[in-house]
Each structure stands twice: as structure tokens, then as C-alpha cells.
């Protein structure tokens, strides 16, 4: 059995609401200032197939709760609520239409933007296609060039292989020659070892000879006077420039003096020109500083028919009847070149070229 369900909607309205309702009903707003609470019934649609008569009865029962208020008051309160619902629906419809219009505008703008973007992308794709075509053509040309180069490289490789084969053959020939050279080298090394041993033996002999030579030089040093290694004179001889001079302490005739100088591997000294400020003059003063006045020495200049020096130089002069030989004579402090009988006995001066110290 279906039971009747009563819905009661109770709303507590504050003072401002009461004043607004009273103003609408044309009542005094201060009529309800006694603190009474006003109950308002709201019209609701039927729920779950409840008939409108039942809803009306429910509302009627709710209206009976406040028996003190008249029926006119109830109707006046109910009518404005229903009037407020209708403008709300109209406003919602307007907002809905406005939203639909804005949505359509957005869709239109979106479609335009998509179209423009489509055109841009299409142009970019066309440009990309042209670039790809150019690139493809370039790649084809490069590919053909690479194929040509590979063919050339293959030919070069074949040529290199042939050259490698020839080089290998030449290398084998060189290896055989190298082996032969190694054999010769080993033989040379054996000879070198023998030569080295011989050289060591010769070196030992050379050292022994050098030692003997050093000992001999030490023994010979007292017999030689050396200004340097290339200018040496026998002991007792006087060195002047690159010549050695020997002044005898004994007297002999000219011929014996010449022979005595020859036994000493020398010859009689020659002084071609003797005059003050001449080289020979100064040399005689340095050679015979202690020579007193009247001292004479045989020299190599003899006066036969022709004045012939012992060094084979010629000087033509008138000769005397008897054989005369040259001598150097000191008178006081002057040296002169004079003639003397070759048989006279005088000291003599021998001259020889300075020599290198014996190695």
C-alpha cells in the first residue's frame, strides 16, 4: 500500500528577509517585531510520481501549522518565489547561448590558425622537398664520382699488388745479398780481430819505442839547445834566428878551419856586408860581445881569382898575387871584413842551419 509522504521545507528567515516580504505584501515591517518566527512554504514539484493533489495537501498541512496568519498572507509569500525562478532560467539560457557563441568563435579562430599553419607547413614541406631533390641529385653525382674513384682505386690496388710482388722478389734478392754480405762481414770481423791483436802488439812495441825515444831524448837534451821544437842547435853553439854559430877556441889556417867546420856538419860563416847599422854588424857585436881590439876570425869568403863565397855566390873583384882569405876583424869597436893570408892561423866561426829536435 502506498503511504502518503509529506515533505516539509522549513526555512528560517532573518529580519531583513521579513522586512522585504512585508514590504512586498504592503504590511508594516514593524508588525512582527514581537519576536515571532515566520515559516515559509516553498512550492516543489512532485517527486516519484506523487500526485499534485497530494503535494497540495502537504502544502496545505504545512500552512496549517501557522494558524494565526491569514490565507492571504500565504499566497502573497508564495507568488514572489515563483516569480524569481523564471528570470533565473532566462539568465541561465542567455549565459548558455553566450557560451556557445564564444565557443563557435574560438573554433573559428582555431580553424583559421590551423589553416594558416597548414599553409606554412605545406610551404616548408615543398621547400624541404626541393632541398631533398637537390641533395639527392648531389648525392647521386657524388655516388657516381665515388664509384669512379673506387674503380680507379681498384686499378691502383692491382698495380700496387704487382709492385709489391716485384718488391718482394727484389727483397728476396737483397736478403740473399745480405746473407752473403753477412758472411763477408763475419770474415772481416775475424780479420779485424786478428788485425786488432796485431795492432795491440804493434802499439805495445810503439810504446816501448816511444819510451826508448823519450829516454834517448832525455840523454840528448844536454847536447842540444832548442829555442823551439823546430829550431835546435848543438850544445855550445849560439842560435841566431834560424842559424847556429860555433866560435872556435883554437886557431887554424883557413883550409883546416873549413875542414873542421865540415866535420861538424857545417861550414864557415859568411858575412857578405859589414858596415855600421847593418844586420851583420849588430849580429857580430851580439855574437862576440867580449871580443877585444885586434881579434880576427876566419869567415867563408875567400879571395882567389874571384871572390867566391862558400855558399857558391859570386862577387867579382880584383885579386892579389898571393892567395888571400877573408876574415872579420875588430878594430877598437868597429868590425870590418878584411883579407888575410890563408896560411895564417886564426880562430874561425862555423855556421849551420838550425834543425828540428830529433824525434
UniProtKB/Swiss-Prot annotation:
<dbReference type="InterPro" id="IPR016186">
    <property type="entry name" value="C-type_lectin-like/link_sf"/>
</dbReference>
<dbReference type="Pfam" id="PF00059">
    <property type="entry name" value="Lectin_C"/>
</dbReference>
<keyword id="KW-1015">Disulfide bond</keyword>
<dbReference type="InterPro" id="IPR039689">
    <property type="entry name" value="CD72"/>
</dbReference>
<dbReference type="GO" id="GO:0030246">
    <property type="term" value="F:carbohydrate binding"/>
</dbReference>
<feature type="disulfide bond">
    <location>
        <begin position="233"/>
        <end position="244"/>
    </location>
</feature>
<dbReference type="InterPro" id="IPR016187">
    <property type="entry name" value="CTDL_fold"/>
</dbReference>
<feature type="modified residue" description="Phosphotyrosine; by LYN">
    <location>
        <position position="7"/>
    </location>
</feature>
<comment type="function">
    <text>Co-receptor of B cell receptor (BCR) that plays both positive and negative roles on B-cell functions. Recognizes the Sm/ribonucleoprotein (RNP) self-antigen ligand, and coligation of CD72 and BCR inhibits BCR signaling. Mechanistically, ligand binding leads to the recruitment of PTPN6/SHP-1 to the BCR complex which is inhibitory to BCR signaling. Also acts as a ligand for CD5 and thereby plays a critical role in maintaining regulatory T and B-cell homeostasis.</text>
</comment>
<dbReference type="InterPro" id="IPR001304">
    <property type="entry name" value="C-type_lectin-like"/>
</dbReference>
<keyword id="KW-0597">Phosphoprotein</keyword>
<dbReference type="GO" id="GO:0005102">
    <property type="term" value="F:signaling receptor binding"/>
</dbReference>
<feature type="topological domain" description="Cytoplasmic">
    <location>
        <begin position="1"/>
        <end position="95"/>
    </location>
</feature>
<feature type="disulfide bond">
    <location>
        <begin position="261"/>
        <end position="350"/>
    </location>
</feature>
<feature type="disulfide bond">
    <location>
        <begin position="325"/>
        <end position="342"/>
    </location>
</feature>
<dbReference type="GO" id="GO:0005886">
    <property type="term" value="C:plasma membrane"/>
</dbReference>
<keyword id="KW-0812">Transmembrane</keyword>
<keyword id="KW-0675">Receptor</keyword>
<feature type="modified residue" description="Phosphotyrosine; by LYN">
    <location>
        <position position="39"/>
    </location>
</feature>
<comment type="subunit">
    <text>Homodimer; disulfide-linked. Associates with CD5. Interacts (tyrosine phosphorylated) with PTPN6/SHP-1.</text>
</comment>
<feature type="glycosylation site" description="N-linked (GlcNAc...) asparagine">
    <location>
        <position position="136"/>
    </location>
</feature>
<protein>
    <recommendedName>
        <fullName>B-cell differentiation antigen CD72</fullName>
    </recommendedName>
</protein>
<keyword id="KW-0430">Lectin</keyword>
<dbReference type="GO" id="GO:0007155">
    <property type="term" value="P:cell adhesion"/>
</dbReference>
<feature type="transmembrane region" description="Helical; Signal-anchor for type II membrane protein">
    <location>
        <begin position="96"/>
        <end position="116"/>
    </location>
</feature>
<keyword id="KW-0472">Membrane</keyword>
<feature type="topological domain" description="Extracellular">
    <location>
        <begin position="117"/>
        <end position="359"/>
    </location>
</feature>
<dbReference type="GO" id="GO:0004888">
    <property type="term" value="F:transmembrane signaling receptor activity"/>
</dbReference>
<keyword id="KW-0325">Glycoprotein</keyword>
<keyword id="KW-0735">Signal-anchor</keyword>
<keyword id="KW-1133">Transmembrane helix</keyword>
<dbReference type="GO" id="GO:0050859">
    <property type="term" value="P:negative regulation of B cell receptor signaling pathway"/>
</dbReference>
<feature type="domain" description="C-type lectin">
    <location>
        <begin position="232"/>
        <end position="352"/>
    </location>
</feature>
Amino acid at each position: 500500500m502506498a503511504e502518503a509522504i509529506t515533505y516539509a521545507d522549513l526555512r528560517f528567515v532573518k529580519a531583513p528577509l521579513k522586512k522585504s516580504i512585508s514590504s512586498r505584501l504592503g504590511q508594516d515591517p514593524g508588525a512582527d517585531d514581537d519576536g515571532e518566527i515566520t515559516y515559509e512554504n516553498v512550492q516543489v514539484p512532485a517527486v516519484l510520481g506523487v500526485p499534485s493533489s497530494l503535494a497540495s495537501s502537504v502544502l496545505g498541512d504545512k500552512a496549517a501549522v501557522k494558524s494565526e496568519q491569514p490565507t492571504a498572507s500565504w499566497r502573497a509569500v508564495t507568488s514572489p518565489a515563483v516569480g524569481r525562478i523564471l528570470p533565473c532560467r532566462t539568465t541561465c539560457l542567455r549565459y548558455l547561448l553566450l557560451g556557445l557563441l564564444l565557443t563557435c568563435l574560438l573554433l573559428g579562430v582555431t580553424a583559421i590558425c590551423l589553416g594558416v599553419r597548414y599553409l606554412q607547413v605545406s610551404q616548408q614541406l615543398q621547400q624541404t622537398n626541393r632541398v631533398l631533390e637537390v641533395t639527392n641529385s648531389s648525392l647521386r653525382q657524388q655516388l657516381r664520382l665515388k664509384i669512379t674513384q673506387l674503380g680507379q682505386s681498384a686499378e691502383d690496388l692491382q698495380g700496387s699488388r704487382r709492385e709489391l710482388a716485384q718488391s718482394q722478389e727484389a727483397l728476396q734478392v737483397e736478403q740473399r745479398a745480405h746473407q752473403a754480405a753477412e758472411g763477408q762481414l763475419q770474415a772481416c770481423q775475424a780479420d779485424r780481430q786478428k788485425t786488432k791483436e796485431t795492432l795491440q802488439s804493434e802499439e805495445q812495441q810503439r810504446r816501448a819505442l816511444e819510451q826508448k825515444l823519450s829516454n834517448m831524448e832525455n840523454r840528448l837534451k844536454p847536447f842540444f839547445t832548442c829555442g823551439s821544437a823546430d829550431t835546435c842547435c848543438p850544445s855550445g853553439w849560439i842560435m841566431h834566428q834560424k842559424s847556429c854559430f860555433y866560435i872556435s877556441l883554437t886557431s887554424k889556417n883557413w883550409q883546416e878551419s873549413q875542414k873542421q867546420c865540415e866535420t861538424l856538419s857545417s861550414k864557415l860563416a859568411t858575412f857578405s856586408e859589414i858596415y855600421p847599422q847593418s844586420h851583420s854588424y849588430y849580429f857580430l857585436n851580439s855574437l862576440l860581445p867580449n871580443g877585444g881590439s885586434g881579434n880576427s876570425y876566419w869567415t867563408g869568403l875567400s879571395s882567389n881569382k874571384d871572390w867566391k863565397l862558400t855558399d857558391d855566390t859570386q862577387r867579382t873583384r880584383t885579386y892579389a898575387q898571393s892567395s888571400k882569405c877573408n876574415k872579420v876583424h875588430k878594430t877598437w869597436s868597429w868590425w870590418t871584413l878584411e883579407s888575410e893570408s890563408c896560411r895564417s892561423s886564426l880562430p874561425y866561426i862555423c855556421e849551420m842551419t838550425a834543425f828540428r829536435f830529433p824525434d
